[in-house]
Amino acid sequence: MTPNVLVNGIGASFGIATGPVVILMGPDDFGVMIDDAVLVCPMTTPEWVPVMTRASAIVTDEGGKMSHAAIVCRELGVPAVVGTGSATKDLNGVPTVTVDGSKGEVYGS
């Protein structure tokens, strides 16, 4: 069976993780983050690190292999797909996903 690829991007931190989707558009949304969720956001900056440590995986609209999200995810050992272009839109309403940080793919679960 072929996985249902919902989003493609750059595999920025190796590993595979599954979890509920939480879309955060900025720091004002940090309060809705839940532990072990897949964090989906436009991009990250240093103020995002406390939220990033709670994620099972991270998916961003922007960035590359040397972006803040990619570097922090590698340090934390959290799978990441960056530079998707539209994950915050494409994953809106999707309850759960699996992130493959090696292939740069996000699958519907």
Model-derived regions: residue spans:
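Long, low-complexity segments enriched in small/aliphatic residues
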Residues: 1-5
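Acidic, glycine-rich flexible loop/linker segments
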Residues: 7-37, 42-109
